[in-house]
A protein has these predicted regions:
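Compositionally biased accessory segments in Actinobacterial proteins
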Residues: 4-12, 16-358
Length: 358
C-alpha cells in the first residue's frame, strides 16, 4: 500500500469517527487485510450501541461537537464513546445527563402510574466503573460500550451521586443487578412489539454511532438533533444563512460501499436551487434512506437552512462558550467570523490575506 493511500485512509477514518490522528493511524495498522475499515457490530453489541445512541441525546443544547459526542472508537466487540465536557441548556453537565438517561432504576409505588414504568434503559448495566470511564453492558451479555469524557470527569463520583439521590427519593437503582428487575421485565412484556422493533432495527443507530464524526467533519450544520419512533429515525440539521447544506457529501459518506452502511437513497427532495424560495424564510431539503429490502429501519435527514429573519449570533456565542473548534465554526457559521481574527490566523500560519488580494 502506498504512503499516500495509507494517509488518505487514516484521514478518512478520522472523519468518520472523530478520533485523533495517532489513534486513527494505529487503528488502520491493526486492520486485517480486506476487512472493513469500520467494523459492523452484531447481536447484543449492536443492540447496546443502538440503545446508548438513542438515549444519549444531549438535550436541546449546543455542544463543541454535534450531539455532544467528540469521538467514537468502534471495535467488533466494544466501542468507546467520548462525550464533550459541556453543559446542557439547563446548566447540567452533559455526562451527568447521559448517566440519568441511561442507568435504570425502579420507580417507587408512590409515584407510579398505570402500566409498567421505570427510568433509564431496561437491561443496561454497569460492568466496570472508574474515575475516568463508565463501562456499560447489557444484562446477561458481554457487550461493551465505554463512556469517557473530553474533560476531567469523575465518573465514579457522578454515578455514586446518582445512586444516592435515587435511593434517597425512594427509587431502586438496578444497574448493578445480575438479572432484569421486576419493572424492567414488566416493561419488556407490556411493550414487546416496540422492544422487538427497536432491536431488529438496531443496526441503524449502531452504524450511525460508529460514524458520528461525519456530523462534525463532513456536515455543514452548526446544530444537529435527532429522535427515534420505533424503527424510524429522524435527524434535523440546522444551517446558518448563506451556508449550503452538504447533504450530497454526507449521504455519499453514509452509503459508501467500503466505509459506509447498507443504506440506499429512497426519496430525495431538495430546495437548494429552487428559484421560488424566499430567502427571508427557512427552507428544508429532505433525504430518506433505507436498508436492504425488507430490513427494518429508516433514516430521514432534514437539512434546514435558516432564513434571513433569524439572528444566529447568540447561537454562535453559545458555541464559542462551549469551546467549539474555531476552524469548524468558521466553516459552519462564517458570517460571524471576525475579519481581524481571520487575518491574524492567516498571518500566524504564513498565509496571505486572501481578501486583501482580491
Amino acid at each position: 500500500m502506498s504512503r499516500g493511500y495509507a494517509d488518505r485512509n487514516v484521514r478518512r477514518y478520522q472523519a468518520y469517527t472523530g478520533i485523533g490522528h495517532q489513534a486513527a493511524l494505529q487503528q488502520m495498522k491493526d486492520k486485517a487485510p480486506g476487512s472493513r475499515p469500520i467494523s459492523t457490530a452484531q447481536g447484543a453489541q449492536r443492540q447496546l450501541e443502538g440503545l446508548v445512541f438513542e438515549h444519549l441525546k444531549g438535550d436541546v443544547a449546543y455542544f463543541a461537537h454535534p450531539l455532544g459526542i467528540a469521538s467514537v472508537l468502534p471495535g467488533p466487540g466494544a466501542s468507546t464513546v467520548t462525550l464533550d465536557d459541556s453543559m446542557t441548556r439547563h446548566g447540567h453537565p452533559l455526562v451527568a445527563h447521559a448517566i440519568e438517561g441511561l442507568l435504570p432504576a425502579e420507580v417507587p409505588e408512590s409515584v407510579r402510574t398505570e402500566g409498567s414504568e421505570h427510568i433509564g434503559v431496561s437491561g443496561i448495566r454497569v460492568a466496570r466503573l472508574s474515575r475516568r470511564a463508565l463501562h456499560l453492558t447489557l444484562v446477561g451479555t458481554s457487550a461493551s460500550v465505554v463512556l469517557r469524557s473530553a474533560g476531567d470527569t469523575d465518573w465514579a463520583a457522578l454515578v455514586g451521586e446518582r445512586h444516592s439521590d435515587l435511593s434517597g427519593a425512594g427509587y431502586r437503582p438496578c444497574w448493578n443487578e445480575p438479572t432484569l428487575a421486576e419493572q424492567e421485565r414488566e416493561f419488556r412484556t407490556d411493550h414487546a412489539d416496540y422492544w422487538r422493533a427497536t432491536e431488529d432495527a438496531s443496526w441503524l443507530p449502531s452504524g450511525l454511532l460508529r460514524r458520528v464524526g461525519l456530523l462534525h467533519e463532513v456536515s455543514s450544520a452548526y446544530c444537529t438533533r435527532y429522535w427515534a419512533t420505533w424503527d424510524d429515525w429522524k435527524f434535523e440539521l440546522n444551517h446558518d444563512q448563506d451556508v449550503l447544506p452538504a447533504h450530497d457529501a454526507l449521504v455519499e459518506h453514509l452509503i459508501d460501499p467500503k466505509w459506509g452502511m447498507e443504506l440506499r437513497v429512497d426519496k430525495r427532495h431538495c430546495q437548494c436551487d429552487a428559484v421560488w424560495v424566499d430567502p427571508h424564510y427557512d427552507r428544508e431539503c429532505r433525504i430518506e434512506l433505507a436498508g436492504p429490502q425488507g430490513r427494518p429501519g429508516t433514516l430521514q435527514l432534514r437539512f434546514r437552512s435558516l432564513g434571513t429573519w433569524r439572528d444566529s449570533s447568540s447561537t454562535h456565542a453559545d458555541l464559542l462558550r462551549v469551546q467549539a473548534d474555531h476552524r469548524w465554526l468558521h466553516r459552519v457559521m462564517p458570517r460571524h467570523q471576525s475579519p481581524s481574527l481571520s487575518k491574524a490566523r492567516g498571518r500566524r500560519r504564513g498565509r496571505p490575506d486572501r481578501s486583501a488580494a482580491q
